[in-house]
Swiss-Prot record:
Core subunit of the mitochondrial membrane respiratory chain NADH dehydrogenase (Complex I) that is believed to belong to the minimal assembly required for catalysis. Complex I functions in the transfer of electrons from NADH to the respiratory chain. The immediate electron acceptor for the enzyme is believed to be ubiquinone. Pfam families: NADH5_C, Proton_antipo_M, Proton_antipo_N. This is NADH-ubiquinone oxidoreductase chain 5. GO terms for biological process: ATP synthesis coupled electron transport; electron transport coupled proton transport. It comes from Salmo salar. GO terms for molecular function: NADH dehydrogenase (ubiquinone) activity. Belongs to the complex I subunit 5 family. PANTHER family: NADH-UBIQUINONE OXIDOREDUCTASE CHAIN 5. It catalyses: a ubiquinone + NADH + 5 H(+)(in) = a ubiquinol + NAD(+) + 4 H(+)(out). Its EC number is 7.1.1.2. The keyword Amino-acid biosynthesis does not apply. The keyword rRNA-binding does not apply. The gene is MT-ND5. Keywords: Electron transport, Membrane, Mitochondrion, Mitochondrion inner membrane, NAD, Respiratory chain, Translocase, Transmembrane, Transmembrane helix, Transport, Ubiquinone.
Length: 612
């Protein structure tokens, strides 16, 4: 075996061993110590992160991709399933980022969840999730990818419903798992199609043997899977609802790692779809619709976590647009930069929520810049990175995506929607900063404001550094697989920046108008549309079940009762027998002439029958 391959497979084995060790210690019947989460879990993830840097440096030095197949799981005459790992730039870059972000979030969770009696179990769930995510990222066949896919799904369900005493948390967890189940149908059907038509689940073999086939059907299944997992329009309501879980869960699963699994699936299998115009157009239009719709919903939300959740969904839509543009590497770059600042925004939100007695309404915050200067500064940095401010992390990916979109010869409507959503990103980001950091405090004086704990400061600080320099580091060290546009007109080059600045100006105007409005709640249709999330949950979660119940009630009470019990049952017997009864009773009238006539007729009939 080549030494590079040996080192890569050994490091992955070490990462899995380090992450599994804390889980194995929990099998001991004696209960864990109070600080087990910090001594075992956090240390294991930190060590795994440091180990994962080794393959990254080797890859930077040599630039070689490696596939390691070490164990045959199952085989038949035409089909085999191996344990196979793929070390390409997607898995080698994303694994350290996932470990780094998780390390920061778990340290924050040790402060955020310190009063929870089951904190050790919470950390165990997060660790299981991380293992499933790394399996998904490094998988080289659909079977392993499916194991990781379902693993992150079930851990998401358990962690959203962590506070299971609350009805909202249970509903949100069920909602998440049902929407994901719809997406999983697409993935399972695609896997079945690949197994029956290509006789292989190995990704390289699938690429090689599918060149002559029409892949529209399985690609639509994969897009459905990505729509469910990455909260694209139609299957998006679960992501804002998932904010019922603890803030560390929102920061890890529902912003930086799990929700990008759907996009990652499409990036990993992109060679299948790069020449299929139907699939690419579907991705482009679906992504553009998602990014604008969810950005519109974020404009009027007042729950700080919901705003950040909708911004996540909006950025996932932008990644889907990028896949539709045939630029998977740019989508992956945006995944990497987005992980840092979005996780940091959630941690800053969690810190502020905790400091204000669990208050999540931004209208009841304000003036936090003087009270929690570090957290507020990082919240501002994260918001600026999200809007694509030049030379922060988000700029390098977002600007490249908008450039690729501007210079492509594709759907102009998708371009318009995406640029409008980019402008809205600036609006809701500045709105959060305005309501949370600026102005005067609008909360009770008894709020226990405290940001002196290193478990709060250090994770946010690490992610802040990532939000500032990650984009520069990644773009300066990796060559793009497709040559970017070298020259373009100045207006096109500045398009992303101009719409962002216009969004910031609109946000400032709106924020100042907020203090001058006469009615507390606007009655505009547009405001209601945005605030009610486009009436989507009301229609899908309320109207559809109501119509189903009404239909069921109609079938049960009217169709079954009236048809079976009345028309066919007792009343039916009466209605069928009544004509015969009336006919026979009319015949028996006591008239001798009639009887005599009938007697002669019947006698004559009998004689005729005997004669013939």
């Amino acid at each position: 075996m080549h030494p590079t391959t040996l080192i890569l497979s050994s490091t992955l084995l070490m990462i899995f061993a380090l992450l599994l060790y804390p889980l194995i210690t929990t099998l001991n019947p004696t209960p864990q110590q109070e600080n087990w989460a910090l001594t075992h879990v956090k240390t294991a993830i930190k060590m795994a992160f440091l180990v994962s840097l080794l393959p990254l440096f080797i890859f930077l030095d040599q630039g070689t991709e490696t596939i390691v197949t070490n164990w045959q799981w199952m085989n038949t005459t035409t089909f085999d399933i191996n344990l196979s790992f793929k070390f390409d730039h997607y898995s080698i870059i994303f694994t350290p980022i996932a470990l780094y972000v998780t390390w920061s979030i778990l340290e924050f969770a040790s402060w955020y969840m310190h009063a929870d009696p089951n904190m050790n179990r919470f950390f165990k769930y997060l660790l299981l999730f991380l293992i499933a995510m790394i399996i998904l990222v490094t998988a080289n066949n659909m079977f392993q990818l499916f194991i990781g896919w379902e693993g992150v799904g079930i851990m998401s369900f358990l962690l959203i419903g962590w506070w299971y005493g609350r009805a909202d948390a249970n509903t949100a967890a069920m909602q998440a798992v049902i929407y994901n189940r719809v997406g999983d149908i697409g993935l399972i059907l695609s896997m079945a199609w690949f197994a029956t038509n290509l006789n292989s689940w190995e990704i390289q073999q699938m690429f090689a043997s599918s060149k002559e086939l029409d892949l529209t059907l399985p690609l639509m299944g994969l897009i459905l899977a990505a729509t469910g997992k990455s909260a694209q329009f139609g299957l998006h309501p679960w992501l804002p609802s998932a904010m019922e879980g603890p803030t560390p869960v929102s920061a890890l699963l529902h912003s930086s790692t799990m929700v990008v699994a759907g996009i990652f699936l499409l990036i990993r299998l992109h060679p299948l779809m790069e020449n299929n115009q139907t699939a690419l157009t579907t991705c482009l239009c679906l992504g553009a619709l998602t990014t604008l719709f969810t950005a519109t919903c974020a404009l009027t939300q007042n729950d700080i976590k919901k705003i950040v959740a909708f911004s996540t969904s909006s950025q996932l839509g932008l990644m889907m647009v990028t896949i539709g543009l045939n630029q998977p590497q740019l989508a992956f770059l945006h995944i990497c930069t987005h992980a840092f600042f979005k996780a940091m925004l959630f941690l800053c939100s969690g810190s502020i929520i905790h400091s204000l007695n669990d208050e999540q309404d931004i209208r009841k915050m304000g003036g936090m810049h003087n009270l929690t200067p570090f957290t507020s500064s990082c919240l501002t940095i994260g918001s600026l990175a999200l809007t694509g401010t030049p030379f922060l992390a988000g700029f390098f990916s977002k600007d490249a995506i908008i450039e690729a979109l501007n210079t492509s010869h594709l759907n102009a409507w998708a371009l318009t929607l995406t640029l409008l959503a980019t402008s809205f990103t600036a609006v809701y980001s500045l709105r959060v900063v305005f309501f949370v950091s600026m102005g005067h405090p609008r909360f009770t004086a008894t709020a226990p404001i405290n940001e002196n704990n290193p478990s709060v400061i250090n994770p946010i600080k690490r992610l802040a550094w990532g939000s500032i320099i990650a984009g520069l580091l990644i773009t300066s060290n990796f060559l793009p697989s497709k040559t970017p546009i070298m020259t373009m007109p100045l207006p096109l080059k500045l398009a992303a920046l101009l719409v962002t600045i216009s969004g910031l100006l609109i946000a400032l105007e709106l924020a100042s108008l907020t203090n001058k409005q006469f009615k507390t709640t606007p009655n505009l249709i547009t405001h209601n549309f945005s605030n009610m999330l486009g009436f989507f949950p009301a229609i899908i979660h309320r109207l559809a079940p109501k119509l189903n119940l009404t239909l069921g009630q109609t079938i049960a009470s009217q169709m079954v009762d009236q048809t079976w019990f009345e028309k066919i049952g007792p009343k039916g017997v009466v209605s069928t027998h009544l004509p015969m009864v009336t006919t026979t009773s009319n015949i028996q009238q006591g008239m001798i002439k009639t009887y005599l006539t009938l007697f002669f007729l019947s006698t004559a009939l009998a004689v005729l029958l005997t004669l013939t």
